[in-house]
Amino acid sequence: MKKVLIMTPDIEGPVRNGGIGTAFTALATTLAKKGYDVDVLYTCGDYSESSASTFSDWSRIYSTFGINLLSTGLVKEINIDAPYFRRKSYSILLWLKENNVYDTIISCEWQADLYYALLSKKNGTDFENTKFIVNTHSSTLWADEGNYQLPYDQNHLELYYMEKMVVEMADEVVSPSQYLIDWMLGKHWNVPEERHVILNCEPFQGFETRSDVVVKTNETPASGVELVFFGRLETRKGLDIFLRALRKLSDEDKETISGVTFLGKNVTLGKIDSFTHIMNQTKNLGLAVNIISDYDRTNANEYIKRKNVLVIIPSLVENSPYTVYECLVNNVNFLASNVGGIPELIPQEHHAEVLFTPTPVDLYGKIHYRLKNINIKPGLVESQENIQAAWFAAIERKDNSVFKKIDESNRPLVSVCITHFDRHHLLQQALASIKTQTYQNIEVS
């Protein structure tokens, strides 16, 4: 079987409940179970959101499922005067060159981890026998548009470009939704012809729930329906739409509601955090309000699978969210906005019952309807067998990209012209960089 590397800045364990981490953990365990030799390279070094387990603990846990969990951080031997994401991508290139043993490498476009590695392959210098699959999830530009966020500085614009180029230089692109491919094409990205829509694999269920977190259960169902906002507590996830819809609840509606829960990560919203924003907006609601932010994915799913729960997912923009996916595969009652790739997850005949336009009025109307018709469980549009088969086919598919080999006999003189004025330190850095080039026929002027 082929040797596969899944390279990701987000993986279950070190990261608590990210969508990319959920997707790549699910893919890694699916491939390992099939018999592939799977390594996972976590690219954020020592960063961890896990208080109960170290990275070594998680590496040991993953090994029990046939996966070798590795990590890499910024290279310290080279002084790189560049933004973090560029230093990180170059450090990853060096790691991949030292560990050039993989038949297939899978990564996402977010953070542009693969930029320099793909550039090296396109230049004909490395990775002739490695196929790179970019599994698109959410570029920074796409996320910023959803959050109505302008770029912070020129570095942000550079990241936009690098993430775009990661997609364009890929040997193959796999997206969990046609929507995201259409979005990239609409931005005039040169998406490779070898592109496919394959849903994410079902979330891995083998991890134990955290012992330091007690998930509330209701063996005796509450007298009313609990509304659960499920997702990161931010604008893009529809937080404000949900809060405004709650204000429209009538006294009759409230009689059938046991409480409102916000289940997701706390984030900064301007000068305050989402906790403060939620409490300010719900202080006169007249219903019990609960905010839960310390659950990982496993704990969160145990919570929403309880009885008399109606999950609300009012996102403004989404690719193929696991919040919806997990409701579908776990038979959880839910409502979701009809944006992005969400409708692609749900059988067409159930769209009218579970989808809404992301406005407070339309969301309230659907909540009002579902309070009286709660049990609607459409199931995922595709079987796990078909999803897994599509992924196995992607791994086995031959790389048809043309590798441009360097002509060793053709070594023209390269003139490097450096402009400088009273910046001796930076000039020394530039000259030192030129001296370390592997190409020797160089002159400096």
Task: Identify the meaning behind each predicted range.
Residues 257-276:
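Glycosyltransferase donor-sugar binding loop
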Residues 316:
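Aromatic "clamp/platform" in nucleotide-sugar-dependent glycosyltransferases that forms part
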